[in-house]
Design a protein with these regions (language model features):
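A donor-sugar binding/catalytic signature common to diverse glycosyltransferases
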Residues: 179-225
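C-terminal amphipathic helix plus adjacent low-complexity
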Residues: 243-289
């Protein structure tokens, strides 16, 4: 499964509630318990309302173990890293396969020469490919940071993959490009500002790049709080210019990111293909028995 946030667990912060982190008080623990119960109640209500349609499939929302039947009872392979997760109580057959996945676009179709910016701290800025409504604010916030940090050069990608490559110099130290593949360009950057999408979140970990996360919706808040608690990223509200400025200052001021280095090494250990093969052999072996 593409995100561990969708599946219910028996403990830990529920997801899609604005980014709940590890509980620090009994009150926060109580809120998270209510969140988990509320999630389950919401699903039961929807299932009840659709009961006539679901009847033909003999659908049951939960099995005897209290686990969701929409997921396999034999094996669930989850993209992501166990080292980052705040939830606990996953089904016993849930396996982490590590962070993977990259752009399908070819890097040679998006030629951006970075050599003229060798004297700058290079900052990759993105809000992904699906948040068209957020791009104006992203450009505005980037311009504010660029004015305050002339020693940095900001590369804003608009996420228009599949189109002809375009590059516009919005300011002396702001380049706006139509699209840049993460895998090829993030390794060449010093810092990343992003929206908290799964792909860029893990690319920053893989290549050891400190990030400032400005979450916009859905599970992006959950990624942001995990990045913050793991010590690999900072976060701010997407339209709070002052908070973004302070967070970016802190990002630049930090010389050492030991947790980021540790998690970057951990990300390399995962072998998703081997895990998949192992699970296939295990399941076939169980069937033969």
């Amino acid at each position: 499964m593409a995100t561990q946030f969708a599946i219910e667990t028996t403990d830990g912060p529920p997801c899609f509630f604005g980014g709940m982190g590890s509980p620090k008080t009994s009150f926060q623990s109580g809120l998270q318990w209510l969140g988990r119960k509320g999630t389950r109640l919401g699903k039961r209500i929807v299932s009840f309302l659709l009961r006539e349609r679901l009847k033909r499939y003999d659908f049951r929302l939960y099995n005897q173990k209290g686990q969701e039947t929409i997921y396999s009872p034999y094996s669930i392979l989850g993209i992501g890293m166990k080292e980052l997760e705040l939830k606990s109580g996953f089904p016993e057959h849930y396996l982490w396969v590590g962070p993977f996945g990259s752009s399908i676009e070819r890097a040679e179709n998006y030629p951006l020469d970075l050599s003229p910016y060798a004297g700058y701290k290079k900052v990759f800025v993105s809000c992904g490919t699906q948040l068209a409504w957020a791009k104006d604010n992203l450009l505005y916030q980037t311009q504010q940071l660029a004015e305050a940090h002339p020693d940095c050069h900001f590369f804003v990608t608009l996420g228009f993959g599949g189109q002809d490559f375009q590059c516009e110099e919005l300011m002396d130290n702001v380049s706006v490009v139509s699209y840049l593949p993460y895998k090829e360009y993030i390794p060449q950057m010093d810092y990343v500002i992003h929206h908290g999408g799964a792909g860029i979140f893990y690319q920053c970990i893989i290549y050891g790049k400190p990030a400032l996360i400005l979450p916009h919706d859905y599970d992006q808040y959950d990624y942001a709080v995990r990045g913050l608690e793991a010590g690999i990223a900072l976060t701010a509200k997407r339209e709070d210019t002052e908070a973004i400025g302070r967070a970016f200052d802190e990002l630049l001021a930090r010389d050492d990111w030991p947790d980021l280095n540790r998690l970057s090494r951990a990300a390399q250990i995962y072998q998703p293909t081997e895990i998949l093969k192992s699970e296939i052999h295990r399941l076939l072996g169980d069937k033969e028995k």
